[in-house]
């Protein structure tokens, strides 16, 4: 789809390499994109190219016409991921991580339960669906609190609040913009270091590709911050925790394909 702040050229790069890899395996490839500025819409990249908006109505017409073996959503960013639920509901095969796993990763409450089950540390959190619930939760979480809606990437709607007035205003604003959304409130780890791991998994074995350390403190969206590869300031103990957590999370989600996990590190504990 179109370039937006926090979502752009990296997904074009992923799509091109995904198409090339599928072609090498002998598959006919079909690319759907409405952005003429991208490499993935060059005439010689995919076998077939549809210049269509990445909306369900258009996608479904193409799928009915082409009858593909499956659809890959994990290379197109949030725009493509949002289509997974409808693809799953209409019985279209998603190649790679299933819709069930994608939904588990994007639903903040369910994902936090998964962390609890796998003994992975996480900041104290709660899930709220109304402003009253959020205010009640703030009593046990202690400020500052990080507020995030579910089912968004790119840091959309994410804010650190420091008192009840801020919290109420932000929650009301979010629920007006995204009705019926579950909001995750967690205690903001002040002064924590942020790191992230990229890995690839086939559902059985996890291969960690790289671990990056962010220069800016935790809470600044990764699209707005700089990261170094390899990390410049993480000890062996912290690195081992990151590797262990990445392995556990990738396998618990039944990941098939790529996964990116972001961590906060405070007092040598990886959250």
Could you tell me what each predicted segment is?
Residues 2-261, 265-271:
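N-terminal beta-alpha lobe that positions the nucleotide/phosphoryl donor
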């Amino acid at each position: 789809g179109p370039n937006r702040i926090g979502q752009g050229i990296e997904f074009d790069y992923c799509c091109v390499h995904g198409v090339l890899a599928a072609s090498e395996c002998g598959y006919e490839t079909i690319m759907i994109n409405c952005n003429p500025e991208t490499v993935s819409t060059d005439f010689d990249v995919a076998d077939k190219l549809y210049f269509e908006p990445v909306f369900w109505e258009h996608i479904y017409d193409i799928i009915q016409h082409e009858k593909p073996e499956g659809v890959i959503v994990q290379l197109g960013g949030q725009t493509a991921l949002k289509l997974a639920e409808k693809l799953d509901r209409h019985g279209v095969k998603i190649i790679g991580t299933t819709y069930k796993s994608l939904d588990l990763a994007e639903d903040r409450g369910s994902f936090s339960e998964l962390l609890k089950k796998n003994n992975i540390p996480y900041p104290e959190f709660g899930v709220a669906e109304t402003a009253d619930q959020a205010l009640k939760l703030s009593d046990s979480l202690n400020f500052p609190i990080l507020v995030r809606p579910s089912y968004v990437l790119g840091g959309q709607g994410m804010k650190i609040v420091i008192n009840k007035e801020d919290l109420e205003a932000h929650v009301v604003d979010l629920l007006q913009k995204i009705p019926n959304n579950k909001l995750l409130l967690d205690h903001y780890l002040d002064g924590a270091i942020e790191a992230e791991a990229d890995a690839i998994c086939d559902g059985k074995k996890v291969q960690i590709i790289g671990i990056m350390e962010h220069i800016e403190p935790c809470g600044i969206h990764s699209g707005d911050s700089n990261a170094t590869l390899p990390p410049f300031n993480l000890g062996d103990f912290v690195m081992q925790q990151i590797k262990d957590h990445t392995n556990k999370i990738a396998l618990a989600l039944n990941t098939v394909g790529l996964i990116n996990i972001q961590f906060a590190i405070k007092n040598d504990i990886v959250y």
